[in-house]
Amino acid sequence: MKINFLTLFPRYFEPLINESIIKKAVDKKILEFNVVDFRDFTKSKHRKVDDEIYGGGHGLLLQVEPIDLALDSLENRGGYKILVTPQGKIFDQKMANKLAKYDQITLISGRYEGFDERVTYLVDEEISIGDYVLTGGELPAMVIADSICRLVPGVIKKESVENDSFQNEGLLDYPQYTRPREYKNMKVPEVLFNGNHKEISEWKLKAQLEKTKKNRPDILERIKNEK
């Protein structure tokens, strides 16, 4: 899979690309990244990529032309194109599973007051990572990319993906423990030591349901409505 990032701050993406599991996948040529500074495509002699808002409003908007020209520079115009914006659909695991099937994805990160609305005509989808505001789209773009990359075959073990939170009916993960067996009167549940795989599986599912009910009751409500 190839992922393009269109941004005004290319160095933001270095930790994602150059560390840990994703770097190993890059070295194995399972993943490929291309970071593009769309400021390089402005026709302004001052390298300006934003301007005042028609009709009034605070701040400056990112112009459509530099982004359009940056997309023109990409192979097959960047594959499936995503605008990272607070106005987009909320990103979730189902979306990650869908996006992981593409050969090439482009994530466009904004700044300032956002994008000229005509940028939305250039993309396939608008995505948000939540109902809150950040200083720019780079961090959300990396969140989306990280979530997608780990689903690409060969990046991590298949078993790890299958056991993730949100993969099993969308439920949160069950509690997990390691040594020591007891710490400051906090004990690991005895069922995990009895060797009865059926009982352990039942405990895990019950624990998933309890944790999901406690922390994300909206997920249970959604699952109920889908059935």
UniProtKB/Swiss-Prot annotation:
Keywords: Cytoplasm, Methyltransferase, S-adenosyl-L-methionine, Transferase, tRNA processing. It is found in: Cytoplasm. Gene3D superfamilies: 3.40.1280.10, tRNA(m1g37)methyltransferase, domain 2 (1.10.1270.20). GO terms for cellular component: cytosol. It is an enzyme of class 2 (transferase). S-adenosyl-L-methionine binds at G110, I129, G130, D131, Y132, V133, L134. Its EC number is 2.1.1.228. GO terms for biological process: tRNA N1-guanine methylation. InterPro entries: Alpha/beta_knot_MTases (IPR029028), tRNA_m1G_MeTrfase_C_sf (IPR023148), tRNA_m1G_MeTrfase_TrmD (IPR002649), tRNA_m1G_MTases_N (IPR029026), tRNA_MeTrfase_TRMD/TRM10 (IPR016009). Its main location: cytoplasm. The keyword Transferase applies. One of its GO terms (molecular function) is tRNA (guanine(37)-N1)-methyltransferase activity. It catalyses: guanosine(37) in tRNA + S-adenosyl-L-methionine = N(1)-methylguanosine(37) in tRNA + S-adenosyl-L-homocysteine + H(+). It comes from the Bacteria. Belongs to the RNA methyltransferase TrmD family. Specifically methylates guanosine-37 in various tRNAs. NCBIfam families: PRK00026.1, trmD. Homodimer. This is tRNA (guanine-N(1)-)-methyltransferase.
